[in-house]
């Protein structure tokens, strides 16, 4: 058995946390030979609820669960953490302006980024799930950079939910098994502006674009369906997507840590300037993962429609970035 990995989870008492923690403890995220210690962060008023979740985790008698800590102090939660899942964020309440949402989350993620950089392992892997995920990841990274120690490239945002949503829509359209679809890409922000791009996707070497061969479906059905899926779930369920978000977080970390065997996945990462995306913007790119590192898939042709979509989602990210600039000093 390997030495335990410390996994910090924020918003541990929330809906996504509840769907996430049991799957981490069961070994779904890091494999069946990897014990974990869960370090659970939530607000002071949520500590009782966290204790209830911990009681349930105990009652599962997971062989891989080597320990648990509950706290409302980020410095304790992130102490020696190998992986940080930043799930907790301020949700948008009725009548709340986007600027207010950015402001509220800016404060949270500035504190957490600093605490991670001061307390976690130097090679810590950070995934921001809480929305607006790309900009929250950007804020955490910027706060962490002031401290140093940790690797800025390891502050990532979750676009895997958009990626998985796109795969399931393509599977339904083509009648192919979802697991057989490869080379899917999602570009940009985790928001309705994201660009799900199946121009390179294949099933057993056959082009998905050729199978579907319908630009109007792509533009008028596929992209809006994937982009607005979160809103459709809230409309139907009365609550935001929690289990599917938790599932995407598991996928994101598992692939990053254990590798993708050459398969493409989507991660929101600090741009290195690839595909004309300005350096430092947290942007969704197709990547492959190996030996605990990700690499952007290079050399893809960007046509006119794709460039327009990529620029639109970039413009939104730039606007969000300007909206939080004053918080970063």
Swiss-Prot record:
Binding site residues for NAD(+): 11-17, 105, 112, 129-131
Positions of substrate binding: 92, 98, 131, 165
Keywords in alphabetical order: NAD, Oxidoreductase, Tricarboxylic acid cycle
InterPro entries per the UniProt record, alphabetical: L-lactate/malate_DH, Lactate/malate_DH_C, Lactate/malate_DH_N, Lactate_DH/Glyco_Ohase_4_C, Malate_DH_type2, NAD(P)-bd_dom_sf
Catalytic machinery residues: 190 (proton acceptor)
NAD as UniProt keyword: yes
Any Pfam family: Ldh_1_N
Gene Ontology terms: biological process: malate metabolic process; tricarboxylic acid cycle
Catalytic activity field: (S)-malate + NAD(+) = oxaloacetate + NADH + H(+)
Single GO term (MF): L-malate dehydrogenase (NAD+) activity
Enzyme Commission code: 1.1.1.37
Family statement drawn from the similarity comment of this UniProt entry: Belongs to the LDH/MDH superfamily. MDH type 2 family.
HAMAP family: Malate_dehydrog_2
PANTHER family cross-referenced by the UniProt entry: MALATE DEHYDROGENASE (PTHR23382)
Its biological purpose: Catalyzes the reversible oxidation of malate to oxaloacetate.
Name this protein carries in UniProt: Malate dehydrogenase
Organism listed in the record: Laribacter hongkongensis (strain HLHK9)
Upper lineage: Bacteria, Pseudomonadati, Pseudomonadota, Betaproteobacteria, Neisseriales
């Amino acid at each position: 058995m390997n030495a335990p990995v410390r996994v910090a989870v924020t918003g541990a008492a929330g809906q996504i946390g509840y769907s996430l923690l049991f799957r981490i403890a069961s070994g779904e995220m890091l494999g069946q030979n990897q014990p974990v210690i869960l370090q659970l962060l939530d607000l002071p008023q949520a500590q009782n609820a966290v204790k209830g979740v911990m009681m349930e985790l105990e009652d599962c008698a997971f062989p891989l669960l080597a320990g648990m800590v509950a706290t409302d102090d980020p410095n304790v939660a992130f102490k020696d953490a190998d992986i940080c899942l930043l799930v907790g964020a301020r949700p948008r309440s009725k009548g709340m302006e986007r600027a207010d949402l950015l402001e509220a989350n800016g404060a949270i993620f500035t504190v957490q980024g600093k605490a991670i950089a001061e307390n976690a392992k130097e090679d810590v892997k950070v995934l921001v799930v809480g929305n607006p995920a790309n900009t929250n990841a950007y804020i955490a990274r910027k706060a962490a950079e002031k401290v140093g120690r940790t690797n800025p490239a390891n502050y990532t945002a979750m676009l895997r939910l958009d990626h998985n949503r796109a795969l399931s829509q393509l599977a339904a359209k083509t009648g192919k098994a979802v697991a057989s679809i490869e080379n899917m890409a999602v570009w940009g922000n985790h928001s309705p502006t994201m660009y799900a791009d199946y121009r390179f996707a294949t099933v057993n070497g056959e082009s998905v674009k050729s199978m579907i061969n319908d630009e109007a479906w792509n533009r008028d059905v596929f992209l809006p369906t994937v982009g607005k899926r979160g809103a459709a779930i809230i409309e139907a369920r009365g609550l935001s997507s929690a289990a599917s978000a938790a599932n995407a977080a598991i996928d994101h970390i598992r692939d990053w840590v254990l590798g993708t065997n050459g398969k493409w996945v989507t991660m929101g990462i600090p741009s290195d300037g690839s595909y004309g995306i300005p350096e430092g913007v947290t942007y969704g790119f197709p990547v492959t993962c190996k030996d605990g590192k990700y690499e952007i898939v290079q050399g893809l042709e960007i046509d006119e429609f794709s460039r327009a979509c990529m620029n639109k989602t970039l413009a939104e990210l730039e606007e969000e970035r300007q909206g939080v600039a004053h918080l970063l000093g």
